[in-house]
């Protein structure tokens, strides 16, 4: 499968058309951004690491009944995917208080939530991806109420599966972001699942092992990403 034309370039990936109108190639970059593109840099080998992790996790989710855009891994940086009409709603699932949940509501960082919190955000960098509810999403024409309920149900299912997966690898899945899209009338999980889109803390030490190391200049960014890759790919 060959790349024919650049369809879209985002902060972390490029998406290329192929000779099959239903399939695209997602190429992972080493570029890193934070705070809605206000901070920019690179993380060595990030594209390779995130592609490997995402391929493994999409395969795991598919084996447990979750419909995703993933088709196959093509190379170190390239993933073959079903072409999606992206729904401009970011679904965030929170298991432990961190990030904007702490800033917005005053939770103590690290507070374990009794039940996961599922949030919806408008996918719009110019507006700083604002928090919204279902009524906003419907009014904006992004999805209907039935579709939004499906997104939340899928997010809850994915959360249960991933929490179990990562706990077995001594990682606390603090929170994570999901994106979905439409493909031939079906809603599929898209984008990626990686230290770019998830917060991971070591279960024993609480050490941050995700893009927060880049956001807040904690150092050891490449080592943290590589360690997550090791635990995801190499541990049973």
Swiss-Prot record:
Enzyme class per UniProt:
ligase
Report a single Gene Ontology molecular function: ATP binding
Q: Which EC number applies?
A: 6.3.2.6
Which Pfam families is this protein grouped with? SAICAR_synt
Coiled coil regions, renumbered to chain:
none
Q: Which UniProt keywords apply?
A: ATP-binding, Ligase, Nucleotide-binding, Purine biosynthesis
Q: Annotated pathway, please?
A: Purine metabolism; IMP biosynthesis via de novo pathway; 5-amino-1-(5-phospho-D-ribosyl)imidazole-4-carboxamide from 5-amino-1-(5-phospho-D-ribosyl)imidazole-4-carboxylate: step 1/2
Q: Report the sequence similarity comment from the record.
A: Belongs to the SAICAR synthetase family.
What is this protein's record name? Phosphoribosylaminoimidazole-succinocarboxamide synthase
- Which organism is this protein's natural source? Chlorobium phaeobacteroides (strain BS1)
